[in-house]
Amino acid sequence: MKEALEPAKKRTRGLGAVTKIDTSRSKGPLLSSLSQPQGPTAAQKGPKKTGPRGCTAVGSVLKNQKLAPTAPAQKPVRKRPGKRPDWDLKGQLCDLTEELKCYREKTQKLDQENQGLQEQLKEAQEQAAALGTERNTLEGELASVRTQAEQCQQKLEALCARVLELEEWLGTKENLIQELQKEQLELQEERKALATRLEEQERRLQASEAALLSNESEVVCLRQKTAAQVTLLAEQGDRLHGLEMERRRLHNQLQELKGNIRVFCRVRPVLAGEPTPSPGFLLFPHGPAGPSDPPTRLSLSRSDDRRSTLTRAPAPTTRHDFSFDRVFPPGSKQEEVFEEISMLVQSALDGYPVCIFAYGQTGSGKTFTMEGRPGGDPQLEGLIPRRMRHLFSVAQEMSGQGWTYSFVASYVEIYNETVRDLLATGTRKGQGECEIRRARPGSEELTVTNARYVPVSCEREVEALLHLAHQNRAVARTAQNERSSRSHSVFQLQISGEHAARGLQCVAPLNLVDLAGSERLDPGLTLGPGERDRLRETQSINSSLSTLGLVIMALSNKESHVPYRNSKLTYLLQNSLGGSAKMLMFVNISPLEENVSESLNSLRFASKVNQCVIGTAQANKK
């Protein structure tokens, strides 16, 4: 079989040069042929041989391409007129123009021929590359076949040897004594091998013991380094903790400089179908820094109808100016509003009670500000979902500093001075009256009996609670809104933080309150069956809002008695009001002129709150 394979090996010699094709030589003559219009072109002569065998393949490819011979370029034919006189410049110019045209046609024809030759050369090179690839493939297959043949030859030789061995074994069966002696020799050799192996194992054992001693000394060194690193880490932790405490102090100081009671005013945009306000009805004067300064003032005009009726003259306009911590015009987005209150999230995590109110008449956009609009549009999310997302994100970042936080949420409404659980589901609805009680005897912490307190750990769980509460909240049709909230909703999130390594704890409530619509009663209103319920609701709403104003004024005046118990709303929020809390009130007003009276009442109430100072907030730490 080896003799059969030898000719095949000889026949395949020299094939390795086929894949290497020198294409650089064909370009030179081709380009030179374009510059020499007379005589045969370089493409007609064919490529030169660059190898003994490999180049023949390229030559055959180029021959198969059947390159079209390029005809020698003809000189532009023109009639040579007689020499024109020197004064006939126009005629001379025509002759030169005609001659230039002929040369341009010749150049264009040569360019076309050059392009055709280049395309033919490219096709020839591609075919040569393909043939080289095919040759490499065939050589690989041939090598594989040779390897298989050699393996088969080896197996055949092994089988032949085995046959001879068996025949020899069968033929020497009578020489059993000699075979036993041979086996004895083999056993002796095996014993020697085992003894050698045992000595090797003993040497390896000694080497392992020496390595163990070396590793033990290295472990001692590493333990010393680890102890040094632990000490350094503890020092860095102490320094980081000191910086964190300083950050909290400066953050709280910054919030105190802004005011522990802050009032923002937001004007909702005009909705579709509503009349456009007259120019100058609502103005937003720029701050000291000009248009780049966020607005903090609002100017509202109002005509005195009574005076115009008496004088029979055009009603004069009275302008009312108000100043707040921040004013949001109708075009403000939810993201802009949230940016102004995002700093309070850190205050809640630091242990400061935080309370955010949304105040205003029915249809002024309070619920939209707090909860947003259902539908999943991120741009329309309210303060509650945005605040929860930011809260969980900051808590996750602070976990790297050793803080762990837990959150427990509740959502109740106060309807006609009755507390209702908005998170009640199924059979829990209506089971037992919800009352505000002390969590433990002697404790300042308040709790609502028969209300659900749900542990939450992510924003999706909070979104599910908001959706459930939105379905359970008391709404009714009013003159200003098709679905008006007729109750105060209070979303409470109890935040508990712990730093186990330092034994620090902080507990603080975060309250997001959507107050019911505030509007005055019309004394000339005819009461029907449904209007009596609306009247009772309005009286209860206005009474609780009035109590809220009295509580804030009492805290500002540092009175000895604060009337928390005059309303279920203030009684429930008493731990989030006062000197130990940070409060923010959103006053929402309508942009319509027909609601100017209610807008003025809301702005005046918010202006009184903005003038209150309740002292320095303190964190609830243990």
Swiss-Prot record:
| The keyword Cell cycle appears for this protein | yes
Q: What is this protein called?
A: Kinesin-like protein KIFC1
Source species: Cricetulus griseus (Chinese hamster)
Question: What's this chain's function?
Answer: Minus end-directed microtubule-dependent motor required for bipolar spindle formation. May contribute to movement of early endocytic vesicles. Regulates cilium formation and structure.
Key word Zinc-finger present in the record?
Answer: no
The record's keywords, sorted A to Z, are: ATP-binding, Cell cycle, Cell division, Coiled coil, Cytoplasm, Cytoskeleton, Endosome, Microtubule, Mitosis, Motor protein, Nucleotide-binding, Nucleus, Phosphoprotein
**Main localization of the protein described in the UniProt heading:** nucleus
The UniProt subunit note reads as follows: Binds NUBP1 and NUBP2. Interacts with PPP1R42.
**GO molecular function terms here?**
ATP binding; microtubule binding; microtubule motor activity
